[in-house]
């Protein structure tokens, strides 16, 4: 026995087994009415249970074979499904006019029968069957990515078809609740996916508008979820007149081993024939042997080479340890391209002038392609950032989905109990600028982390916009590790990272959610969306009166610095745009915290309370300071006897009057208040503190 064959044991079936599944088909003399009622039941959110596959297959047989069971039984579709373990059980009831009449009278169908009794169906058009099947096909291209991506893609296609005047779908079909129902059905129904794909590929005549939509959707579904197959075949296993040659970058021995394993996996995939490009959608056997993680170096090199050729396939992550390999492959491929172009130009050009013209053209072409690639990637990055923000803002989306589903469902489906959605804490290896994903995160896209804004990305770096995992956000996001360590003895509070909301109840809920506290303890400060009073604008009197409030929980640390490049004119929302903030970025906060001390009515001014008004001596380094019993903000006495309100005075978009006066008077070369105000936003919080404490 070859000992090395041990490595391959268990990768191939030795006793193949196919699980038998029974599918019920319905046969009546009023097939169109039955099919329309099946569509109505699905649209109403009724769970057909084990009758769902049979109902969907009944729709397909009616649409493609006009309910001719003999034609269907001799078709390639029926043969493939039988080989896959499906057995067809036909229920005949010639006089039945309602879907209710053909359902077997068995106890476990009782809830379904009760639900269908309340369903009123007035539609009896045959074209509605094709309309429904074409609508289902719109979800195929992004089916393996996730619900949001699939629904967005379907809506874009609906818009295109409506503009072209091909077909118009009912408005209630385009609601989020209904589209999620269809997505779930398509995700779970192998028969519907298979029939749509088979007919989309093989239907060559008799097309109507619905069939053309199905064919178009199936064409877009090719190699969905098989990006590594497409990139390796196009860029690594290069097909030439003399045969298949390996790309120069993968000719080293270790990568060659991965290429050999990949070829073996491809040969297994090819056994599925015309269904191989749809293997991920149909979940065919052998698909698990084509994951990126099984071929890390090959995958990284293939994606780097593809990007160098102008491909915008940037949504795929490679392992963090192989990210540099991807960048190196990109750079090497760009140089190889230039070298090949130079050699071709030398052979083609007849004189020096023509050679210069051709070289200049190819150089411009390369630059244009590169800039266009970066532009597309920038759009993808912004879209991903918006998507992540939407996930955070709609953290109870499941409850909203249930409500929207109830709008299209009948009264018997109304369920007043809300759905609880918890925030999953994930292992944190690095700071991220996105809020934590919710439980129903998009399967493939939610792993592709993004920075909070593409404005922090170096556009000269071709991978700055590619790498969903690898962005270094040191300028825009930072865990309070180095700077906050200077505040010795100040306990880190999970409350400091909580979102601020208009509802006090939501504040309490977020501050008491242990999972979210655990996650946010290590994450950067998420942006504040509402123009509301923050935890830090609460006056000290209120904090003393309510020692158990979440305001006191949130003031264990001084608030993170808040300053922008623009002067603040009024207390409306404005973004916090400094990228040098050691505490991380924070969003909009009520303007009261930025008011100077001279305003006696400012809520942030300390009340007439001895505990809050006592002068507290601070050393410039804050090394021995502990504030376990104190409330923020506080009066601080500097070295030279001046007082200012810490940290409020250091958070303003312009310097407080006391510091301006001191700096103008005491500097050897006095600066004007206007000049100081212009420089103030660019100073870090540490620099502001140092200036203030030495005045």
From Swiss-Prot:
GO terms for cellular component: helical viral capsid; host cell cytoplasm; ribonucleoprotein complex; viral nucleocapsid. A motif (PTAP/PSAP motif) lies at residues 603-606. Residues 438-447 have a biased composition (Basic and acidic residues). Its main location: virion. Keywords: Capsid protein, Coiled coil, Helical capsid protein, Host cytoplasm, Host-virus interaction, Phosphoprotein, Ribonucleoprotein, RNA-binding, Viral budding, Viral budding via the host ESCRT complexes, Viral nucleoprotein, Viral release from host cell, Virion. It holds the Pfam family Ebola_NP. Encapsidates the genome, protecting it from nucleases. The encapsidated genomic RNA is termed the nucleocapsid and serves as template for transcription and replication. During replication, encapsidation by NP is coupled to RNA synthesis and all replicative products are resistant to nucleases. This is Nucleoprotein. It comes from Lake Victoria marburgvirus (strain Ozolin-75) (MARV).
């Amino acid at each position: 026995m070859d000992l090395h064959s041990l490595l391959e044991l268990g990768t191939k079936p030795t006793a193949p087994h196919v699980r038998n599944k029974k599918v019920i088909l319905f046969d009546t003399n009023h097939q169109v009415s039955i099919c329309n009622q099946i569509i109505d039941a699905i649209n109403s959110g009724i769970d057909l249970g084990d009758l769902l596959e049979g109902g969907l297959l009944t729709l397909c047989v009616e649409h493609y074979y006009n309910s001719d069971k003999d034609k269907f039984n001799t078709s390639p579709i029926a043969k493939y499904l039988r080989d896959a373990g499906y057995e067809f059980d036909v229920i005949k009831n010639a006089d039945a006019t309602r879907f209710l009449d053909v359902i077997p009278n068995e106890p476990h169908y009782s809830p379904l029968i009760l639900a269908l009794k309340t369903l009123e169906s007035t539609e009896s058009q045959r074209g509605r069957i094709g309309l429904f099947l074409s609508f289902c096909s719109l979800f195929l291209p992004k089916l393996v990515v996730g619900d949001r991506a699939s629904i967005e893609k379907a809506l874009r296609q609906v818009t295109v078809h409506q503009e072209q005047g091909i077909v118009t779908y009912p408005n209630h079909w385009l609601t989020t609740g209904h589209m999620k129902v269809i997505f779930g059905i398509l995700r779970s129904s192998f028969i519907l996916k298979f029939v749509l794909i088979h007919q989309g590929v093989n239907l060559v005549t008799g097309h109507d508008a619905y069939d053309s939509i199905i064919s178009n959707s199936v064409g877009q579904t090719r190699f969905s979820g098989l990006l590594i197959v497409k990139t390796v075949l196009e860029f690594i296993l290069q097909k030439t007149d003399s045969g298949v040659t390996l790309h120069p970058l993968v000719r080293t021995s270790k990568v060659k081993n991965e290429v050999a394993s990949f070829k073996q996996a491809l040969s297994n995939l090819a056994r599925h024939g015309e269904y191989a490009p749809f293997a991920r959608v149909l979940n065919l056997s052998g698909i698990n042997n084509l994951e990126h993680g099984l071929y890390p170096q090959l995958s990284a090199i293939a994606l780097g080479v593809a990007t160098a050729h102008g491909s915008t396939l940037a949504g795929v992550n490679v392992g963090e340890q192989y990210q540099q390999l991807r960048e190196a492959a990109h750079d090497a491929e760009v140089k190889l391209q230039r070298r090949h172009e130079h050699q071709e130009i030398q052979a083609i050009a007849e004189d020096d002038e023509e050679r210069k013209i051709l070289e200049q053209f190819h150089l411009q072409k390369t630059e244009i392609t590169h800039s266009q690639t970066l532009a597309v990637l920038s759009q993808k990055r912004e879209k991903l950032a918006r998507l992540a923000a939407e996930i955070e803002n709609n953290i109870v989306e499941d409850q909203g989905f249930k409500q929207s589903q109830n709008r299209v469902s009948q009264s018997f489906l109304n369920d007043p109990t809300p759905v609880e959605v918890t925030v999953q804490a994930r292992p944190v290896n690095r700071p991220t600028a996105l809020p934590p994903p919710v439980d129903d995160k998009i399967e493939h896209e939610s792993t592709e982390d993004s920075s909070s804004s593409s404005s922090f990305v170096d556009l000269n770096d071709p991978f700055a916009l590619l790498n969903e995992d690898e962005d270094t956000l040191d300028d825009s996001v930072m865990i309070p590790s180095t700077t906050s360590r200077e505040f010795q003895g100040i306990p880190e509070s999970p409350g400091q990272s909580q979102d601020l909301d208009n509802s006090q109840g939501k504040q309490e809920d977020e501050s008491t959610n242990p999972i979210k506290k655990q996650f946010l303890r290590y994450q950067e400060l998420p942006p504040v969306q509402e123009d509301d009073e923050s935890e830090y604008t609460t006056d000290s009197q209120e904090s003393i009166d309510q020692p158990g409030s979440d305001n006191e929980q949130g003031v264990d640390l001084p608030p993170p610095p808040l300053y922008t490049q623009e002067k603040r004119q009024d207390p409306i929302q404005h973004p916090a745009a400094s990228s040098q903030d050691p505490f991380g970025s924070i969003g909009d906060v009520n303007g009261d915290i930025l008011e100077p001390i001279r305003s006696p009515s400012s809520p942030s001014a300390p009340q007439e309370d001895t505990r809050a008004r006592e002068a507290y001596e601070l050393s410039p380094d804050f090394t021995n300071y502990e504030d376990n019993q104190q409330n923020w903000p506080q009066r601080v006495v500097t070295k030279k006897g001046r007082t200012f309100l810490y940290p409020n005075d250091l958070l303003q978009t312009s310097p407080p009057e006391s510091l301006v006066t001191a700096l103008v008077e005491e500097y050897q070369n006095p600066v004007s208040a206007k000049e100081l105000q212009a420089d103030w936003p660019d100073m870090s919080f540490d620099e502001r503190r140092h200036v203030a404490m030495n005045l």
